[in-house]
Amino acid sequence: EISVSTSLIPRLLPRGVRYGGIIHEQPDTGIECYPLLLEADHDGYLSGDKGERNLPYLEKAACMYPQDPYYRFQMAATLRNMKRLKDSLHWFRCFYEKVPGQAGYRTEGILLYLYTLLDLDGPACLHEAGDIIGREKPVLGKRADFCFLCGLFYMKLVLSDVGQYRHLLPEIENSYLECLRIGEHPEQGGVVGTGSFKAAYNLGLWYEVSGNGEKATEYYRQSALAGFEPAARQLKEMSVKMSR
């Protein structure tokens, strides 16, 4: 399954504005940006060799601009895309330490940092993720993609030690319900579906394993109606089980 993300980027520029940087160039200007009703599809990151090509340029940029958290973010994201998760952690930590609160790439970087910690798993990574979630929740808790990640975090945390974390079981359900309450906001950027069909699907899974078939069917159906094929398959499997 391939996920789709949206992001806002400056591409329609006034005359005279130039790009700066040796890779992942950005407009070298401080003028204000305004949203436009223009969309463009981009599948370049599906290319398997893009990270290998970009990495030397990013390493050079990180050396040239050691105080710039943007290149630390790009180093971390590139290494993550190359499946070098452990190597990416150093760069994520450096990025998180230096990134200013108003940086446009801050939220994306934090979410990728958290997903990397969840993918690496283990008590230390879960503890680190929990600290970051607690610190960022007052601001990022208004975003569906952050709440979606919280649902995954609480699930992993509970499964890591059911006896110790059983009391956090309701947070799994609450996180996905909050995703649906917030809804989709493509103008914010982020993974498509975390405020709709993906959250509904995960709720369906949660209710199914909890033995609540009625609610599982309700949320699987909601997800399937949005065209999410895994939800349609789960609905079909549940129907077969119930007919036996």
Locations of regions flagged by a protein language model:
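Flexible helix-coil transition and linker loops at the boundaries of alpha-helical arrays
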Residues: 61-65, 96-108, 134-146, 180-193
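Residue at a conserved register position within TPR or TPR-like alpha-solenoid repeats
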Residues: 79, 117, 154-157, 161, ...
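Catalytic-site signature of metal-activated, phosphate-bearing donor transferases
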Residues: 1-90, 115
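Structural motif corresponding to the intra-repeat A-B loop/turn of tetratricopeptide repeats
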Residues: 82, 120-123, 157, 166, ...
